[in-house]
Amino acid sequence: MIKNIAIVSLSRGVAGEAFAQHEVEIGLKRLAGYGVNVQFMPNALRGIDYLTTHPEARAADLLQAFRDPGIDMILCAIGGDDTYRLLPYLFDHDELRRAVTGKVFLGFSDTTVNHMMLHKVGLPTFYGQAFLPDVCELGPAMLPYTERYFTELLRTGTIREVTPSDVWYESRTDFSPSQIGIAPAAHPDDGFQLLQGSPTFSGEILGGCIDTFYDFFDGTRYADMPQLCRKYDLFPTAEDWKGKILLLETSEERIPPEKYRAALTHLKNAGVFRAVNGVLIGKPMDRKCEDVYKQLLVEVIDDPALPVVCNLNIGHAAPRCILPFGVRACVDVVAQKITFA
């Protein structure tokens, strides 16, 4: 059972801004209800400007959290877009590998980069939720489906099975205090959807936000990101992808179809689709471009035998499950479940 949680801001420093304090307070009250001890790492609440200017401070927080034997779980506050800037401070002198201990690490979105860092040093992690977007949900409570998996992770330190949500929620556009207690609009959901290939397959899941993976290869957003990712061999090799299950989900930026195609093409050229046993696709926010994305997946992958399963409740569309990386997963679309060894 998780007893001590450290919250880190490895990307954008939203948690330290005044405009987010009502959300932080909500989240802390909910965590208190679990009976866990919560600490913000020293730089986690220093705000957007400071953390943007000081990636070394973000890296220091992560290293300190791993080195502290009293911390059971590292919970990311939120994503962002520049956590790649931590790479030199975590790998130049093998700092991360020497610091890592067996703790639960949970985050998503830009935290995809941190998951790849931790995969590189051999730590299994958990993808799918974060403090501000999930624990600090402005409604009367955490979204029930989201809460179910968060609770399981806190109580057991793992996730044993994932099934689809009965509903999906419209994304919020207003995070002001006026929205406290107001639940997001809900719609019936359709379960896991088999786009192509066998309905059953297995392997260790690895992946994350496709927008972030695009930036691994393309320097339009940050010119030095592809350079640093290559320097530190951050993107897994084709051999590393062999036998795994690729997870892809889209961000709140609602990636345009032409960029989605380009991102898939980068992954294809890296040998990912030839190596993996299957692909899992998270539901897009508000289901925007859903059908176009499916068409592009079929076209770019160009292998009808490779299983592709869509409409998972993972990533930027609410509610969110949690998927373990680094443990064997068995996907069964007919039974509508993913089980973990």
Language model: regions and residue ranges:
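ATP/NTP phosphate-donor binding region
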Residues: 1-70
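Buried hydrophobic positions in well-ordered alpha/beta secondary-structure cores of metabolic enzymes
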Residues: 7, 74, 110, 213, ...
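Long, hydrophobic/aromatic-enriched structural stretches that serve as scaffold segments
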Residues: 67-91
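Structural motif
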Residues: 73-75, 106, 245-249, 280
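Short, acidic/small-residue loops that bind anionic groups at enzyme active sites
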Residues: 92-120, 124-133, 307
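Conserved anion/nucleotide-ligand pocket segment
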Residues: 124-211
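Oxyanion-binding "anion nests"
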Residues: 205-250, 255-257
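ATP/nucleoside-binding phosphotransfer catalytic cores, i.e., glycine-rich phosphate-binding loops
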Residues: 259, 265-268, 278-341
